[in-house]
Amino acid sequence: PDSGNYGFDFFLGNRRVDTRDLYFTSERSGTDQVRLRAATTDPAKFLEITYRLDSVTYFVHTTMRLVGVTDVDPRDIAFQWQLTGLSNEKYRDGELQKSGVYYKYFSDDRNYLSETEQEQLKLEGRTNWVAFKQDFFTVAMISEKGFSSSGPEIGILPLTDSTHTKRYDAKLFFDLERGQEVEVAMKYYLGPNH
């Protein structure tokens, strides 16, 4: 990908909070893990995101925790993800044909959006993973418990400039219960197509 961004957003009371707008402090743990924390005025309430590199595979394990923030409805926590694919080959048309958004419901085989046209899709089942694929490499978001079937959307838009291939979008939700601590566990796959 050329560029991208992602974040969690949710409502705290009647105010929308997006983790892309928060200030985080970082704490490194060994050589393979970093923990980011957004504090509040109450030290018992915070949001924490941990990233851990897998030393054997192409995975980055990610955990987002809301601690002590009980007025957030965890079912409304959305993971917003956008990427713009970079064109790397001389034969751009071939690249466009091999770039796409793939997804897999728990009870089904993998499926994909149009590789030639703009398409948006509301996912209608519990989804195991969503992947943004280019010619040789893929970036995927995987949830072992599955993303919620309530409200998720994915999309793809072919781009017309000579530098980029497509814009990829995903909005994913989680089936979580309210509690003193809410935890969202996922993993990224960042590696070659198999």
Question: Where on the chain are the PLM-derived regions?
Answer:
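Soluble non-transmembrane domains of integral membrane proteins
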Residues: 1-194
